């Protein structure tokens, strides 16, 4: 009598299963030999042409940069892709549009206050446009490139890297718009940057580049405005805002 809910097994299948059981239980049957030990793992090789860093090399570079060792910095947790990255920041500042525009458009002085900027030299200029040679260093790499800058006074400053060896793409845009109506010496600053490293090796430095250069940029220009124009306008805390987006 079949159990309730049981399923009928075809006769051919049942017969085959019974023969298998008789063979496995017969006195002369030999048990299958146990599996042998696994061979020792072969050392992994990394081709230098692939530009992949060993964990030890990542620790050395992180130590040189003064950063804590992290798998997400140059370890295997980071994706091996040369992905374009972007960062944007919007905030109210206690300086006028004209004052902030003057600070940002004065590329010649970047070496005096922009994080990790070692050199800044304007090589040509005409109304609304200029070209500048910049050198930016953040351990363990140094980048020299020409920046093509376009300006709309006092609303916008846009800079594009034209011949860099480190970056495949580097573009920064500053936009200035009116601030709080009741506080005329204020403005809204929108800063955005997008970049992509040329090589996979350098793309692993993206986290450090964000932390050491990009995220400090707006604050550095605000401090420069304080040096040139004095204390900022005092704005009530409830009227302040600061937005950051990163991809």
From Swiss-Prot:
Keywords: Membrane, Mitochondrion, Mitochondrion inner membrane, Transit peptide. GO terms for molecular function: ubiquinone binding. Residues 1-15 form a transit peptide. It comes from the Eukaryota. The keyword Calcium does not apply. It is a peripheral membrane protein. It holds the Pfam family Polyketide_cyc. It is found in: Mitochondrion inner membrane. GO terms for cellular component: mitochondrial inner membrane; mitochondrion. GO terms for biological process: cellular respiration. PANTHER family: COENZYME Q-BINDING PROTEIN COQ10 HOMOLOG A, MITOCHONDRIAL (PTHR12901:SF8), SPERM PROTEIN HOMOLOG (PTHR12901). Interacts with coenzyme Q. Belongs to the COQ10 family. Required for the function of coenzyme Q in the respiratory chain. May serve as a chaperone or may be involved in the transport of Q6 from its site of synthesis to the catalytic sites of the respiratory complexes. This is Coenzyme Q-binding protein COQ10 homolog A, mitochondrial. It comes from Homo sapiens (Human).
């Amino acid at each position: 009598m079949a159990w309730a809910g049981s399923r009928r097994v075809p006769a051919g299948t049942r017969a085959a299963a019974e023969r298998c059981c008789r063979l496995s239980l017969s006195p002369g049957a030999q048990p299958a030999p146990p599996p042998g030990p696994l061979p020792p793992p072969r050392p992994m090789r990394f081709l230098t042409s692939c530009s992949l860093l060993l964990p030890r090399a990542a620790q050395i570079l992180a130590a040189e940069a003064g950063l804590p060792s992290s798998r997400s910095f140059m370890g295997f947790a980071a994706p091996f892709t040369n992905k374009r990255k972007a960062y944007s920041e919007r905030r109210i500042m206690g300086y006028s549009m004209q004052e902030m525009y003057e600070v940002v458009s004065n590329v010649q002085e970047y070496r005096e206050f922009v994080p990790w900027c070692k050199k800044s030299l304007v090589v040509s200029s005409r109304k609304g446009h200029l070209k500048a040679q910049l050198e930016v260093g953040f351990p363990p790499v140094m980048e020299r490139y020409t920046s093509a800058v376009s300006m709309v006074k006092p609303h916008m400053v846009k800079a594009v890297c034209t011949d860099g060896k480190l970056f495949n793409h580097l573009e920064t845009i500053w936009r200035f718009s009116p601030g709080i109506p009741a506080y005329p010496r204020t403005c809204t600053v929108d800063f955005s940057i997008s970049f992509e490293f040329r090589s996979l090796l350098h793309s692993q430095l993206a986290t450090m580049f964000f932390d050491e250069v990009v995220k400090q940029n707006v604050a550095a220009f605000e401090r420069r405005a304080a040096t040139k124009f004095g204390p900022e306008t005092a704005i009530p805390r409830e009227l302040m805002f600061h937005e950051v987006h990163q991809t």
